[in-house]
Amino acid sequence: MNDGELREKALHLSSFIVEAPAGSGKTSLLTDRFLKLLTVVDMPEEIVAITFTKKAASEMKAKIIERIKESKSPFAQTILKRSEEKGWDIEHNLSRLKVMTIDKFCHNVVSQIPVLSKMGSKPNITDTPEKFYEESVKQTLQAKDGIEDIKVVFTHYDNEYEKINRRLVAMMSIRDQWKYRCNMLTQKSSGQIIEEGNAYLEHLTKPIYQKIRAELNQDQLNDLIEILHYLESTNLREDIKLKNKNSFNFDSEEIPLWQTITKILFTDKNTRRENITAREGFKNDDEGEIYKNKCRNLPNIDFLLAIKAIPEPLSETYALKLRSIANILLQCEKKLRQLFKQRNTVDFIEIIEIANEALGKNDAASDLLLSLDYKISHLLIDEFQDTSRSHFNFLKKIVDGWTPEAQKTIFCVGDPMQSIYKFREADVSIFIEAKKNGFNTIPLETIQLRDNYRSSSTIVNEINQIFENILPKEDLIQEGAVSYKPFVSAKKEHDSNVSEFKFHALTFTESTDIDTEEAKYVCNLIDTFPENEKIAILTRSRSHLSELINYIRKFKPTLKFNAVEIDALDKHQSIQDILSLSYAMLDLNDRIHWLAILRAPWCGIMLNDLALLFQNDHTSTVWEIIQDENKMSEISPDGRRRIRRLIDILKNAFDNQSKTHIRRLIESVWMNLGGELCLHNPNDIVDINKFFNILQTSSSPIAIDFELVEHQITKTYLSDIPSAEERIQFFTIHKAKGLEFDTVIIPSLNSTTRASDKKMIVSDTSVKNSRIFDITAFSEPDNKSPHLHDLIYGIEKSREENELKRLLYVAMTRAKTKLHLVGSVMHKDEIKPASNSFLSMLWNIYGNNFYEVKPIENIDIDIESSKIEEFVPKLMRLKLN
């Protein structure tokens, strides 16, 4: 079947999972499905469409509404007829169309059950819960209960308080991953933990042992035993204790012995050892030479190197430490829940957990679940590859008991090749599992689309050639790897000459500032495009954009651009002014912030007036001084008018302070002072509202937690809504997902991001021959290896590396007609890319390009202005009538 026929099939009243590449119109298909279902349901609320971002939810709902209002559309006519028959009045009751984020859906569930939710009322949701995490850890470490566990943890981590504190705080942000496991650990004996851990090690070593027995015959195994007995007799090694061993048992107890064998046969660089000496335990005599030759005569057994990563069998001490760490983590989680309840605030993890609890424990359906089941008949999930385990468990409970015969359907749409939200706990293996096993009890028929309606054939062909070499040939669930599925361009091209793909290889001399020179190169590249062409510049992280943005601001000010969520709120002068107003209103003695509000644009006192008022009085408060008529008579008439206006507004606010929530009080003062009139860009009001929302969630009716406010404004980013005149847009790749642009430039290919801290505990679950291996390990304070934690963490790193490949795929598939990749390297003795960079993935394809170009020392560019005033954001001083 072609794509058109498959899209038609996807509208049938059955359950499907649709796998479709970038630019294939997935959201449009889901919209069609929603509209089709509206023609058969009894109530619109029976259909629930779920996305993972507010933006996607609002866009999808807007599309559905637009289609319903298309009077000539067959869908619209049928839906409106159904609406009239059933009394929906859908045209005037658009809120009955249930399109929302997964977090909003969970929140709605929780809001129906305030008693079960343990919150008492509908909680606020915070996007920046870090301060809650920090406080919960602080309270746990200062508590008297659990002191023995705290001692064990601190002893294990060498009493490094800062490191322990930082890692515990980090664990709070992923507590849904470990809470269940930690609860289970605290109920197990040391013997159980040791037995399960060693069984896991045997599970990992079994394939290595099988390979040894397949590659080495009995004579060669006997030679190895003889070599070991000889080395034990020389007393030159301390790591061989055979105890009359005459054969190999191939069990977990032998892991250290096989690791010793790898040290004897291989160098630290994992190459076969040619020069065997006394360092390996061999004497320099005839007998020693015999056993050296036995080593040399062994066949190629490089596969044995894998056993180097296997740790020694677990011990009683290990089990004790693991339980203590689990207890501390659970105490932190308990304190966090108490803090959430006190503040009536939760994070997204808490919402999903409360929702899961509310929907029944131990798979028993609660009354609420039965109620929801009655209401919901069709579940549609967009971007299904971004689902986390917690979300998936929640959704499975929603559809618990559904059967195909009941005319209830599930419709999942997504592209595993665009799964890039691991940092939000998205698990791409869920998509793969659902294709294979269905959604809970509902089997899903797979629909595979191939057409791309976004990109030109030139770009599609290049992307296919690149990613067929980068992504694997088959899905590897444990490693979080998804196979590459080529797609085809369905775009009608009027002029194929307009489309282009180019890789820019830049090699610089050692003395060059690569970031600055690459920024110049990209500026020159932008100048080559027509002025009416929209350009997107995409990078892995915000920091990769900073040099280019600063360069344009300073030297190319005529290039109009917007940078989407690149700068934090605390970088916005208007936000700083409102923050000063907040500090000042709650503390009359805060001289610095009172002076700041006098200088703010909505007050606008000149420096000369400030000097006259305050230079001789360092003890009175600012509030007292500005109400002193003698001192006020010394300043300019304009200054007096401005200050008297400020006093009138503040006096009114202070009189009503006890009657109004502090957020509303400060917001009304700012508005009355003319704060909105002083904004340089009218769109700035969006970010001002973000600040006031932070103030709301960080305050009681009469007080503000300023430490929390200051923290949150560093973690919340400016919106920068694009205007028509801004032809250049800067995005991180994650922010650009779902968007498309005429021209895409991907610079900083050789840049990397900071490695994440090791998690305090990690877990792995694998199934072999119907046996489930579920293991948890804790991190070690030193770099000695191997550790069980490092072994499992290695699997985690593989998943991150595979996601990084998909991130590049997402970036490249944003382009419609032009795609430019820019990579820069330093010319040294050896030209090579940075590990864990986009360029390292592309090196096998484009690496030779860097050897074919002459090293650059400096790139010429036409600088428009270097005046510092062009670099400083403009402020507007309020004009008094």
Model segments located where?
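Conserved catalytic motifs of ABC-family nucleotide-binding domains
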Residues: 756-795
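Anion-coordinating catalytic cores for phosphoryl-, nucleotidyl-, and glycosidic chemistry
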Residues: 548, 566, 795, 800-812
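P-loop NTPase Walker
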Residues: 1-117, 222, 234, 243, ...
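Accessory alpha-helical DNA-binding modules that contact the DNA backbone or grooves
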Residues: 616-649
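Core structural elements
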Residues: 97-107, 156-177, 325-331, 346-351, ...
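Conserved ATP-dependent motor core of P-loop NTPases, especially the RecA-like helicase ATPase domain
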Residues: 2, 11-18, 51-52, 68-254
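Conserved motor-region signature of P-loop NTPase helicases/translocases
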Residues: 1-62, 66, 131, 135, ...
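Conserved ATP-driven helicase/translocase motor core recognized via long
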Residues: 21, 167-346, 520, 546, ...
